[in-house]
Design a protein with these regions (language model features):
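A compositional/biophysical signature of low hydrophobicity enriched in polar/charged and small residues
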Residues: 1-106
């Protein structure tokens, strides 16, 4: 199953909700949501810095990942950015592809 990294930034409303509910409750909500899409949360970490939460999850495909990001962001508590993750074996497969390319100006 494809793996994704969701980078999450809390909005002021999202931060208020976090302060009210706590991190464990939000982790449980995320787990149920991902499982409802046929996936599984691998990790969920709160962080300092540009992003507030990092979630790695397996999902059935890009449309599931897109649906998750759209619905969660539309609710207004967070803004998400989704990164498709590749395993070492997927990179091995990618480098075996023949790609016809010419750099600009070459």
């Amino acid at each position: 199953m494809p793996k994704y990294l969701f980078k999450v930034k809390l909005t002021p409303d999202g931060l208020k909700g976090l302060l009210k509910e706590g991190g464990s409750a939000r982790r449980d909500v995320v787990g149920r949501m991902v499982e409802g899409l046929g996936g599984r949360v691998e990790t969920m970490y709160w962080a300092f810095g540009e992003d507030d939460v990092y979630v790695t999850a397996e999902l059935p495909g890009n449309t599931s990942a897109a649906a998750l990001g759209m619905v969660v962001s539309a609710a207004g508590g967070v803004r998400t950015s989704t990164v498709v993750l590749l395993s070492a074996e997927e990179v091995d497969e990618a480098v075996r592809h023949q790609v016809d390319y010419r750099a600009p100006g070459a």
